[in-house]
Every structure is written in C-alpha cells, then in structure tokens.
Amino acid sequence: MVVTIYHNPNCSKSRDALRFLTASGIEPQVVPYLEEGWSHDQLIALKTASSLDWTEMLRPDASTLLKPLIIANDEVAIINYLIEHPEAVERPFVQTDKGVRLCRPLTRIIDIIDQTPESPWLTEKGKQIL
C-alpha cells in the first residue's frame, strides 16, 4: 500500500501522524508541502478525496480570512491563496489506497491504514491514542 503524508515538521500533530505511520511499520512518502508548495491539482484532489469543504481544510485563521471567498464559492481565488500561502492548509493529510483523511484527531488515520502500532501508543505530548 502506498501511503503519503503531507507533512509540516513544525506541527506536533503532523509529527505524531508520521511517527504513528512509522510505528505501524509503514514507510510513507513524505511531502514537505511548506517547501514544495501546493499545486492546483493537489488541492482539488485532496478536497475531493477527503470530502471536506474549504472551511474544514483550512487553518482557523485562514478560514476566517477567506470567509468572503468561501461564501462566494470563489474556488480559483481560494486555491491561488493556498498556493501562495501553503501554511494555510490544515494538517496533516494522509493519503492511502483506502482514501484521504485530515488526521485531526489522529485516530482518523486508523481506517485508511492496514496496521497500527502496538498499544499503548502515545503522542509526543503524552496523550494515549491506542
């Protein structure tokens, strides 16, 4: 199974998702989207595959900032903003053959991977997930 994580190493949730995958025996393809940026096609594919709307895909501050564009359903302007400001996309997104999930909370990752780490599994902040 091919597993891809759209990863922000500055985010504890993203680091936890990556650790969870590797502890599960999965070596994911890591996409450092802050460095590489987003493409129009990537954003549309994530939105479609995750069944999320723009408000759910955005960090809270970006969602507030882009609210007029979201209400106007101005997808082109929203995507252009996200291409210019990749940090505005919520994280982490994980993609497998079973689907795409915004892994907030981290437990959303479980239904799209074939195995999980041994229990107990703790986040870097000490919260038990399994």
Segments (PLM) and residue ranges:
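Thiol/selenol-based redox catalytic cores and closely related redox-interacting motifs
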Residues: 33-130
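Local sequence-structure signature of Cys/Sec-based thiol-disulfide redox active-site neighborhoods
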Residues: 1-24, 28-33
